[in-house]
């Protein structure tokens, strides 16, 4: 953490640090509004993926000096629907663009009573509606103690833990909702590559394939059972799947080898199938209701695995112009057998 913090400071990207009562350290980068690092007590090993350009001041300076998307890594907040907000020529898919008002945005740090929040006031353009919508995104952080700390019959000796709660809010700030605009929060975590994403489901649910840039996802890497989707994220290129809100249980995990140990990262969040989940397949824009996504990236953007979830939209037809989301990240690192047991308890799955 010290090296990453120093590099960012040297290139004019200062960080903030949230410390939990259990010793967890959460490294926040206001530039882009991201949680860039998650560290267990006494550990300098980041649970999250960060861009390799951040390994030195020279490469970081060159990276942030470019006009490309500055994908620093970690846990970020975007907005849906992707078709409107990232494809300026939709339904043509010839150009993908991260609106700079959103990422990196212009997040401001607000400090109060020893805590802090990040606030981004922005306007985004909807390509299909040909409308601009003024918004406000606010993010803050709190503790998330080990969910297994009171459980009996499990030996957590030798297992590192780090966790936090992220509070995210979205508001339409104009006096009226422009046109028929609906917009939803979309939170994404980037993790080291080569692991398995584990998506528990209430019943058997076949994931929707969104896109592949090279070939497709081999059937042996995308396994569906009655109560679990397992995506082995090891393909070349970029690949994405999406899962229905009515099926998912509100937890998604990612397990991968970490040196001599294994790491398990779990996101715990609220799913409301009565809400409007507006991120739709690009070829079927009236097919609403997808809440969870997984994206495998092994391309010029880097090598990482993304765990993504959506929050029901606000705006036209929803009766709301403001929403709040609260979600936890629970991260474990330790011997494989113990991490498997944790995965079984919290997700109904293990690394096998």
Per-segment meaning from a language model:
Residues 1-165, 169, 173-352:
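Surface-exposed acidic/polar loop and edge beta-strand patches at domain peripheries
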């Amino acid at each position: 953490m010290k090296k990453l913090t120093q590099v960012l400071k040297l290139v004019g990207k200062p960080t903030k640090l949230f410390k939990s009562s259990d010793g967890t350290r959460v490294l926040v980068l206001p530039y882009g509004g991201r949680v860039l690092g998650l560290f267990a007590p006494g550990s300098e090993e980041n649970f999250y993926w960060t861009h390799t350009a951040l390994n030195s001041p020279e490469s970081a300076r060159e990276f942030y000096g470019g006009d490309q998307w500055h994908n620093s890594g970690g846990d970020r907040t975007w907005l849906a629907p992707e078709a409107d907000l990232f494809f300026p020529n939709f339904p043509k898919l010839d150009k993908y663009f991260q609106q700079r008002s959103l990422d990196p945005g212009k997040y401001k740090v607000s400090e109060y009573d020893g805590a802090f929040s990040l606030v981004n006031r922005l306007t985004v353009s909807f390509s299909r509606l040909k409308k601009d919508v003024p918004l406000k995104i606010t993010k803050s952080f709190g503790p998330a103690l080990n969910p297994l700390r009171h459980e009996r019959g499990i030996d957590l000796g030798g297992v590192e833990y780090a966790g936090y709660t992220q509070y995210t809010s979205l508001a339409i700030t104009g006096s009226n909702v422009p046109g028929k605009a609906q917009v939803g929060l979309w939170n994404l975590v980037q993790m080291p590559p080569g692991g398995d994403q584990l998506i528990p489901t209430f019943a058997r649910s076949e994931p929707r394939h969104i896109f592949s840039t090279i070939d497709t996802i081999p059937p042996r890497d995308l396994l569906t059972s009655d109560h679990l989707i397992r995506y082995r994220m090891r393909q070349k290129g970029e690949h994405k799947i999406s899962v229905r809100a009515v099926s998912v249980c509100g937890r998604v995990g990612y397990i991968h080898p970490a040196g001599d140990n294994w790491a398990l990262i779990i996101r715990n969040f609220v799913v409301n199938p009565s809400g409007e989940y507006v991120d739709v397949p690009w070829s079927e824009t009236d097919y609403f209701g997808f809440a969870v996504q997984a994206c495998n990236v092994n391309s010029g953007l880097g090598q990482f695995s993304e765990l993504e979830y959506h929050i029901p939209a606000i705006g036209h037809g929803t009766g709301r112009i403001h929403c709040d989301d609260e979600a936890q990240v629970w991260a474990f690192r330790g011997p494989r057998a113990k991490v498997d047991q944790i995965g079984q308890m919290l997700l109904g799955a293990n690394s096998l």
